[in-house]
């Protein structure tokens, strides 16, 4: 301990001497605060002191010049000036595709006027309600409401006769996520109870989500509705989709769940008070009409695809759920669906887990021909190392200590954001994302740092 104290004292003294030299006019070495070399000495001394203040749990100083850059390339180049226009054209082209399909069996030719979508538009996002929403989730929610408002306003501008166009936000909660304390292993097989199966678990953080969503809906003037996983699996197209998934499970299992080579479909045990589900679907048994699931305590239970109330109980892992949801959206001729999600789901993830299976589905069924999901990706919030900001339950203890020291606890939790900044904190995040939607090249940056948002929450505008 004395050695630690002496190291700390020496580092502090070095910094003090450097700072003192700033108070001496025309010091003999000629060093001034504008000298790069002197700046480097100051920064090095600051870091040296930080390293020994708490040597068992060090903090590191992140120095930067406060300048932000938006180099164009890829999406930021293609959508530099406008994102809403191309999105609306894509939705209108989907309607034209449907009309062409219908016209192929009739003598009526589709109208090829300036394309404007006429069907209602639903802007989607999802969240696991297993924590108070953190900064990344709040950014996705802001993006959803702001792009919905921009779509509505653009439609009002280009097609006044369609000013009653229905644009709505839909937030789906993944209430089938596991309650961590209810995950167990029996005979090498993992079982879980989900948030919808554990009494009171779902309500723990739901108030935070509802409060944030209510504010954003008011600010944007766009209504929102909330849904749960049973709503997805109650869609009338889902039994047919599940039948196709089961028929092609030999190929899909390795695509959607390569670790276990099994379709990650599950259903909670229906015995009162149990609710266990086999997490990875390794013990499932399939027929063309049903899925048999296994409970370690109560044995086999069956869901029939012909019974809608039973199908609504089905759960799926993220890739399988994404595929089923995308298929149901493509098959919906009455509405347009646009999804907003984090950019960690872009690229290879979608190519492997979504687009390859979709291509095979369209080829084998001739459904959804010429159509793909409409997905927009929100930039990630990343820490100093470039790792995305994550829920505290996925980060080791003390993983975000530096954020707490810097007063950035609010980035990890909406409840803490409210406690530290009140409504103004969310307002500043909203205003920042609003500037991205107004200048869409900013949406195509891979990420923004926690340090960047520290400035935003402090009321600083970066240049």
Model-based region annotation:
Residues 1-135, 153-164, 168-170, 247-328, ...:
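Non-catalytic terminal extensions that flank enzyme cores
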Residues 136-147:
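Active/ligand-binding-proximal structured segments within catalytic/core domains
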Residues 163-165, 171-175, 224-237, 374-380:
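Acidic carboxylate-rich catalytic motifs and surrounding loops in phosphoryl-/glycosyl-chemistry enzymes
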Residues 177-190, 241, 388-396:
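Charged, often glycine-rich, active-site loop that binds/positions anionic groups
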Residues 182-204:
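A charged helix-plus-loop insertion that forms the helical arch/lid used to bind
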Residues 200-268:
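A broadly conserved sequence feature marking short terminus-proximal activation segments
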Residues 229, 335-343:
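Active-site rim elements
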Residues 344-356:
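P-loop NTPase catalytic cores that bind/hydrolyze ATP
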